[in-house]
Amino acid sequence: MVVSQNWIAIDERTWRYEDGGVRFFLLAGAERALLLDSGMTVHNARELARQLTDLPLSLFNTHCDIDHVGSNDEFDEVWVSPMELVHPKAPHDSRRVRPVWDGDVIDLGGRELEAIALPGHTPGSTALLDRASGMLFSGDPIQRDGRIFMFGPMRSLAAYIHSLRRLSLRKAEISSIWPCHATCPVDVDTIDELIAGAEAIERGEASFTVDEVHGNPVRACDGGPSILLCDPA
């Protein structure tokens, strides 16, 4: 079988797929494999994953923005935070939803992944921490050289700051961070740098420019490692 050149091996059990401006991940254990998000432009993520593993395959959504759910319809079951079900792109057939709460552990067989809730970017944004390796698959909330969407009715800067502060308390457990956008991987110090940047935005002290994203006026605020796209003042 020909393996797509978009697949990049991280180690012998972990891969990332570069899908334009977004990426998704494939994690394998001894018994099962897990796809973290399902792409933006691709609609055959299951088939792509089969290029690398024949283990039973499940899908986990870090959140349900449109650039993370491109192949969701390929899967009968989706692991996702119930807090994310308000999202218009979330699976609304309850039979397809396997709820994942903060602190839940997904065991792939000798490889445990802990769900860490990171609300703010979206209500149900959730990262997965590989407990053995310390690799944190962060979704969108943690980025370096990226543009983090914080505008619109479902997003909350205050919740985002709280999530990052909570995550910062666990930095000793994290060896590297693997975001779905921009630079990858990033170092653990990115968490505290984003906290400082977001707090400056909250205080009204961060510089910004006026921009437009998908027809929405936004403030493109200096958030330290990344730009935070916030609602107009």
Enumerate the predicted regions with their spans.
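Active-site HxH/HxHxD metal-binding segment of metal-dependent hydrolases
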Residues: 40-114, 144, 196-204
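Short, contiguous alpha-helical
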Residues: 118
